[in-house]
Amino acid sequence: MMLKNTMLKAVLLAITISWIPASIAAPITTTALGHNSTTEYINVPFMPYANPNAPKGGTLSLEARGTFNAANKWMTTGVAMVGTDYLYDTLMTGSLNEAFTMYPQLANKVTYDPDDTSWIIYHVNPAARFWDGSPVTSSDVKATYDAILNKGPMYIRSYLGDIKDIEIIDKQRVKFVFKSDDNKEILLTVGQFPIFAKSSIDTDFEKITLTPLMGSGPYKLGRVDAGRAVSYVRDHNYWGRDLMVNRGRYNFDMIKFVYYQSDEIAFEGFKSGQYRFRLENKASNWATGYNFPAVKAGLIHKETISSENPVPMQGLVMNMRRPLFQDIRIRQALTAAYDFEWMNKTLFHGQYERLQSFFHGSELAATGTPSAAEMQVLSPLLAKLEPIQRQAVLTEWRLPTSDGSGFNRKALLEARQLLLDAGFYYDDMKLYQPNGKLAQIEVLMTGETMGRVLLPYIRNLKRLGFDATLRQVDGPQYYERMRRFDYDMVVDVFAQSLSPGAEQAAFWGSAAADEAGNANTIGIKNIVIDEVTSALANAESRDEIVLYTKVLDRLLRAGHYLVPLYGKSATNVAYWNQYRHTEKLPTNAVAIDYWWTDKEAEARVNQYLKQ
């Protein structure tokens, strides 16, 4: 998973360089790194999903949600504008066709020792330049990481926690030294972050401002309509335009994000051409909403793009920091109260899948009962698990199902019995905890999109006797409450790549549970999960990565830490018929950076919208 707003790419590294003999024990210098992954594109002129002859020009316009007041997403305050990654280069960039392989960007090569992975040297390309023409140097790299490690979000600091020191060797070479050689993937992790100019960092890193830190990326900040829209304009003097990974990439002269407060308003904006490329996440829209005049005129294209990545786990998180959720039987009951079959039929037109795995739809998902290899990992750990979780780990996993009628009677009766078994009791039609307190649950949300999904769930909780409420707050309040873990239940999304690793500790690790702003929104503290995530981070082969991920999957499911909602193994996109892409897209992404504008088609669209 590439670094996100989102979300971090799991970086793999029992580094395999296929053209280097395994017997060489001395440090080597190379232009590509793959951790338990292929390095197929070491000698190609451009990526197979790129069109090196793609025309430059046009505008890519997309939607964003909420608002913004800052340009730096790497500090702990403010709400950053969408799209700032276009302003910066990373030391290396990943292939979208391989599990995890990195190719040169700001760095044109690396030096490391396969037998001692406690350090790596990145060689900054002497041709690399910031927007103002000044060279990118090792001092800028060190200053960037020093700022992120000392002032960045806690989950990022945790992710980079194995960095011991950063040494400037000379103007072009920077050496990362790690606390041990156990974490193989950290060598590649440090190649994934944007690099800022030291001069900007020294004065502006923690300022809440709409002026970005100085970068070297393919775009500069264009027009900003505070809180409403932001655009990025292509830098025609971009130093890296001829790099292998960039040929046929960054083809749009402008990339614009238009902000909306709700999906309904955003969809209307798409219909009227306010923005022209849309990721369609609403099933009812996809099934029946594309019948407006522009569709009938042949100017809107709908496309379903497949992906080999795991389907992101979207679920209703139960905050384990709250006493209410400590008993696993309560969490089981809350899971049973969610009626997926009715929702999928009634709200989603049957388009979604129930997520049976935290790595759903990939080779990483645990299926059936544990294999012999999985049992070898699990056997010494089982005694440390509570009985219900232990039993669920050892059996085939299946979430509760209903007949889709909307009554969900069988599951609710089972949920009621689980509550009674846990010591809850009823008095005057109300549900009370064993300590005599009323059983109350507030589900936190922002925006309106999830309301129609959550309200039926709230009704089922009330049928069980809970004093359940849905609390909608504005964006800034939501983000602050999320940062402080101030919620009972909330929808969260855990995106995964095909190469999970050290970032799993940030999602599920005990150390992350009490760090404000970290990614462990559930608050899991489980020593067995800690041991398995550690083993996964130190995996030395692809087989080990798959093995430990499947074991982790079983543990997370068996803990009933969230209510899995729904997902889909493909991405639905709709766009005004001015955009083009290569015939074969990459296996792991939509790869919008490699699309381009058909100028004649764009003219037809513009003419239509003027009518």
Go through each PLM region and give its residues.
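Surface-exposed binding/hinge segments that line
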Residues: 123, 157-202, 206-207, 216-225, ...
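Aromatic-rich, solvent-exposed beta-strand/loop patch
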Residues: 106-108, 113-115, 131, 136, ...
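Detector for C-terminal structural segments
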Residues: 26-27, 31, 64, 82, ...
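Extracellular/periplasmic solute-recognition and catalytic clefts
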Residues: 165-168, 222-233, 258-322, 329-333, ...
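Ligand-site clamp/hinge motif
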Residues: 125, 207, 240-291, 332, ...
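Aromatic- and charge-enriched surface segment that lines or borders ligand/interaction sites
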Residues: 109-153, 169, 175-177, 266-269, ...
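Gly/Pro-rich hinge or "lid" segments in bacterial periplasmic/extracellular proteins
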Residues: 67, 78, 87-98, 190-249, ...
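N-terminal lobe/hinge region of extracytoplasmic solute-binding protein
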Residues: 26-115, 123, 146, 214
